[in-house]
Amino acid sequence: MCLILLKPKSVILPKKLFKNVIEKNKNGFGFMLLDKQKNIITYKTISKNWEEHYDAFAPYNNNDYEVGIHWRLKTQGDEILENTHPFEVKKDEIYMMHNGTISGLQ
């Protein structure tokens, strides 16, 4: 099952977490947040390099940001960037992460 984590502003995540999670959830990584100007920032990759994941996340790993993070464990669908979270629902307005399979959408 995928892992979704919400990092509150008051929490700093340890680098070791990224190393541990990638052992089981290695089929995609992504995160989303609002920057200080209230712009939506997203990042996603299918790289299996946990240090790359942490390095992309590190600038937001402080008390200024609440961050939604998703580590994918593939159950269906290809291991491609398009199947990696967060998903854009409405550009620059709505992004989502979910657990499980959603099918039949157009």
Located regions from the model:
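GIY-YIG nuclease catalytic motif and its immediate N-terminal context
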Residues: 56-62, 78-79, 83
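Short, acidic, Ser/Thr-enriched surface-loop or helix-capping motifs
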Residues: 97
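Extreme N-terminus nucleophile/cap motif
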Residues: 1-53, 67
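Short histidine
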Residues: 103-106
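Flexible, charged surface loops at secondary-structure boundaries
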Residues: 24-25, 59-63, 88-91
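Acidic loop->beta-strand submotif enriched in PP2C/PPM serine/threonine phosphatases
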Residues: 75-94
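Active-site glycine/GP-rich loop and adjacent strand/helix microenvironment
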Residues: 100
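Regulatory input/activation interfaces that engage signals or partners
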Residues: 60, 64-65, 69-75
